[in-house]
């Protein structure tokens, strides 16, 4: 509960994900943040419910172990067997989540809060993590916002000074995810003007080839 308050309620823009997810997903469970939609979902969870969830999904055959450092593969296997070998496998439900229908119209939400600066958050549906184009979107997000020479930073922050900061990134979801653009317009710049400038840059991205040197920054 304290983590929910700290991350989602007690800081500016902390609940952006809670507001954006239901806009983007109408059927898929991604509309639910992992931590819950509101504080009551955490507060009202019983110990029995938590234990049932744990023993339903937390099993060695439903986990990935990542090991880094100065260790050989053989040592990693030996230590894994030592510390986790006695944990029994369990029957885990087959992952069968509903597919999100194609979005055919724009959805938008305007929220007024006591925050330091206006902020613009845009999201577009993209392919899932297993699709070859996933890496294309990953590179496109870098072309748009990774480094001072990136398109959004160069054109909208440095040249036109429409934004004080702006970023583009992908959600990295296993199922179909989102391509995000988030930025804070400069003082005196309306959200409408800021949004129009971003859309212009996206149009330009479709019309102009990306230089080779920029695609590997």
For each predicted feature, which ranges?
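Charge-rich, well-structured scaffold segments of protease-associated domains
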Residues: 1-92, 110, 128, 136, ...
């Amino acid at each position: 509960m304290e983590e929910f308050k700290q991350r989602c309620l007690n800081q500016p823009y902390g609940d952006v994900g809670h507001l954006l997810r239901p806009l983007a997903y109408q059927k898929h469970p991604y509309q639910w943040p992992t931590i819950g939609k509101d504080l009551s979902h955490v507060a009202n969870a019983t110990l029995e419910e938590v234990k049932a969830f744990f023993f339903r999904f937390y099993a060695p055959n439903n986990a990935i172990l990542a090991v880094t450092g100065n260790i050989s593969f053989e040592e990693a296997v030996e230590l894994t067997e030592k510390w986790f070998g006695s944990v029994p496998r369990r029957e885990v439900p087959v992952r069968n989540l509903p597919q999100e229908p194609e979005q055919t119209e724009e959805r938008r939400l305007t929220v007024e809060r006591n925050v330091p600066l206006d902020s613009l958050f845009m999201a577009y549906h993209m392919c899932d993590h297993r699709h070859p184009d996933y890496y294309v979107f990953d590179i496109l997000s870098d072309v748009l916002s990774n480094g001072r020479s990136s398109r959004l930073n160069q054109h909208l922050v440095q040249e036109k000074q429409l934004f004080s900061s702006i970023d583009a990134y992908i959600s990295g979801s296993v199922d179909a995810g989102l391509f995000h653009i988030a930025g804070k317009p400069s003082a005196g710049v309306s959200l409408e003007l800021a949004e129009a400038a971003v859309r212009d840059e996206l149009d330009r991205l479709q019309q102009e080839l990306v230089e080779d040197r920029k695609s590997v920054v």
